[in-house]
Amino acid sequence: MKLSEIETAVEGLQGVGPSTAKLFSKMGIFTVADLLSTYPRDYEDRTKKIPLSEYKTAKVHTVCKVTGYEWFGYGRMKTLKIAVTDGTAQAWLVAFNRPFLQKSLPEGSLVSVTGQFIEKYGQLQSSAFDAVKIADTGDINDWQNKTAPDSAVLPIYPLTEGLSQKVFRKTVALALKQYGMGIDDEIPQEIISERKLLSKKQALVYVHVPATISQAKEARATLIYEELYLFEQKMALRALEHRGTLPADSEKNQLQNATSSLTKEKFAASLSPKQKQLFERLEFDLTRDQMQSIFEMNAEIDRSQNENNSMENSAWNLQRNPFSMQRLLQGDVGSGKTLAAFFVCLRVVDYGGQCAVLAPTELLARQHADNAAKRLGPLGVKVAFLTANIKSAGRENLLKALKTGDIDIVIGTHALFSRNTNYKKLQLAVIDEQHRFGVAQRESIVAKGRVSEGKYTHTPDVLMMSATPIPQTLALTVFGDLDISTIRTMPEGRKSIKTYLSVMGHEANVYEAVRKELQAGRQAYFVYPRISEESQENQDKSLKSAQEMFTFLSNKVYPEYKCALVHGKTEETEQNALLDSFRDGTTNILVATTVVEVGVDVPNATCMVIEHADRFGLAELHQLRGRVGRGSAQSYCFLIYGKNITQTGIERLKALHETTDGFKIAEEDLKLRGPGEVSGTVQSGYLTLNIADLARDKEVLKTARLDAINFLQKQQKI
């Protein structure tokens, strides 16, 4: 039986009553499987003797003789003090609320003492101690070179109020005794042997009741590997289900593609008619990585088509390959991911299909729609913009055109998968900033194009795009069932953004540096963590607000320049007008909140000032910085932080100061925040790890992934 299949309630264990079971339930522990899967967070090694004389270096664990008692305080506040010695020093055990110890540890008895000792009032004392009697009497000198009989490695579990380590350990021991020997391995035996792992039952014993610290380490190594192996196995099977191949096949192809020489001529020859038109109209060259990514995605779009559905006849045919593209396109800020996605949309249009481009905000959706209309409209592609704010008459006509197939590419927000939105032939769903959408929302847009015929169900091709690079370990876990295309190279002519750190109180220096850029005809952003002083009750009132600073900057600092204020509560029509004014250069300074994190592309803007930068996340700061550096001029980012910045905050800002490489920043973000907070993985609904840590165990992850895929490949051949 697998551990996860043991559904016996904790209350069913001997000695576990309703009140104890209720305490366990507060920790999410309801069954024996939950209990045995709650691993110790640490261990206390009581196998080594640490005498009183070494109290400064470690927690004391020694055998002492009780030499007397004292009491201090009055009435209910009266407290027992027990005098002890282990032959190396004298000490006092301060027994708050434990008067019964006078009887259980009588004078002259030998006791095993474990605790943290400090010097206080001229005495060596401990108030947080364990003391167990081992003999009624005896010579302390006989124990100088011996450890106490209760010596052991004790697991330290996470607890909830009212639940003690003693009760937790006892309950785990009962569960192991009753169910431990019947637990089966979940990893294939050949891999257990090859990787020199423990069996599952042995690993559970060693992790919960280790005889030595090395046993505990061995058990944890096995359980970490097992967790990652099973996760990768699940991802591989999911990939097999929706694309017909295991991840290893795709990775091998990607590696071959990456190392092959994809020339500009070979790339051009692979393009569909409308793709070729766009390629020839571009006023700049695509980067190597853009061409490679488009080439990879084209191959998958072609694969998902049936041979009877060629570009020549553009006939939509339900008898398509049952497997569809499931790909993540990642790249740094400003690397050209959107243009690559437009190329793929054109291939789908050439096949006679429709595309839906989903963005999390109206601002970003509008930018995509404007760019698509500008670049794809002249090619005869019908592009539409759809959000919840579209007026009823126009909306009705738009929805009708979508349903009849008169629209090729629709770009918008959540309205794309609303109940009243229907497509004639949705073939590609592009999901930008995929981490901003939950699993159910992604499924909703895909479901709009899912069709069935006979035994096959065809699902639209899916292209997800990330705003910033995905850490490698997340790419192998959360996105382990996807093919991944990566754009590392930036467009030619871009200069690396120079980033400077400044502490609050020295803003004037930053403002002066920005003034020089404004005098040169450039533009600037100023970003703040809140809208106004009254914007949110739970926000720190000491934080500057966008509204307050707009007034200050426009009246006091830059009265000669035109400033605009944009935030999340700005009306859509007004926001569009303000942003258009900034884009065309009429407005010199844009004061904003993080609403400008995405969806604003102004090549002439060269300064990004972020005040209270320590209040923003690393990925968020990198994304904001990416609003500048989009032209050929040198750009600057100024991060102004508070004087009470935390150590983590300092590390975050240092990472930005030291590099503009989004891939390095993504890895640093993973270290600082953990996988659960990076790239929306909590929202994605995929990642729940119990003992493994992606930042710490990334090499184990790679090994487990390869093992899982290789084993499944062998099973396929059999």
Question: Where on the chain are the PLM-derived regions?
Answer:
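Short boundary/loop segments of OB/S1/cold-shock single-stranded nucleic-acid-binding domains
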Residues: 41-58
